[in-house]
C-alpha cells in the first residue's frame, strides 16, 4: 500500500491528533453548543450525519439537513469537519459540502462489497479516509478494506481502533484487544493509528484510562465523543463526555516519548530486554516440552481406544491453573486465554497423532 504519514497530509499535526464532537448531529442548536466549547482543542470536529442503528425505530440521523447546519457553522467559525460515510451517496454529499475527513464505520468495514463501492466513489480523492476496525477481530478484513482504498488511489489513509464485539462479559462496550491494531501498525508503520476510546468504553468514566493506554502504546491520535448535554443525547448517551470537560480530559493525558534517547536509560533497557529474551526462550522451551508430552498422550489414547477430549481433565487443568495464577499474582483472564490456546493446540496435536496412525494402517493394508 502507498500510505502517507499523518504529518504529510495534516500539516498542523501535533501528537496526538484530536477528533471530537457529538455522536449525532441532532439539531443545529445542539451542534453549536457541543462544538463551540471544543474548537480550540481539536483538529477535526466529528458528527454523525447518518446513524444506522442495530434495530429500527431509534433516531437514525438528519442526513443532508445536518450537513447544512455544519456548513452554516463553518462559514461563521472555520473548522475541519469529519463524518462517517457508508454509501456512495454519502460520499457525494460529503464532497458537495466540503467535508474535510471521512471515516468508514465498523459495520461497513466488515463487508467487502460495501467497501469496494466506497473505494470506487473515492477514486483518486485527496480527502483523508480513516477505516474503523471490523466488528469482530478479523485483521484480514481491516487490512483488506485499507488495501481497497489504497488501490483506488486514496493515499491519505488511516485506521481507527474502536474495539471488538465479544460475547464474553466485559466492563467494556467493545473489548480493546490491543494486539490486533498493534499487529496492523507493525505491518504498516506509516499508517496513522487513531483510538476511539468512546466506543471501546461505552461509559464516560472509562474513556480517560483507555485514551491514556492508547497514548502509552504510541497511537497517533484520539477520537472522543463530546456532547453539550450527554444525558439528553439521542444516541450513545452513556459514552459521551460533556463538551466543557474535553479540555480537562486532554490536559490530564501524559504523552510518552516515541523512543529512548538518554544513554544510561538505553543501557539499562538493553539489560532488561536481554532478560526478557531469555525468559521468552524458557517459555518456548517449556511449551515445546509440553507439546512433546501431549503427543505421547495422544499416542497412548489412540492405542487404548480413548477419546481425545477428556472433560474432567480439562476442568481440573482449568481450575488448578487459575489457582496457580492467583498464587503468582497473575491476571486470571490472561492465564485463561493462554490455557485456551494451549488446549486448542493440544487437541490439534493429538488429532494429528490419531490421523497419522490411521494413515499408516491404510498404507500397510495396501
Each predicted region: which residue ranges?
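Catalytic alpha/beta core domains of metabolic enzymes, predominantly
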Residues: 114-245, 252, 257-264
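Active-site mouth loops of central-metabolism enzymes
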Residues: 16-33, 56-59, 80-85, 105-106, ...
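Catalytic beta/alpha-barrel core
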Residues: 60, 79-87, 91, 100-115, ...
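Glycine-rich, proline-tolerant flexible connector loops at the mouths of alpha/beta enzymes
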Residues: 46-65, 228-237, 297-308
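Domain-level signature for soluble enzymes in the chorismate/prephenate branch of the shikimate pathway
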Residues: 258-366
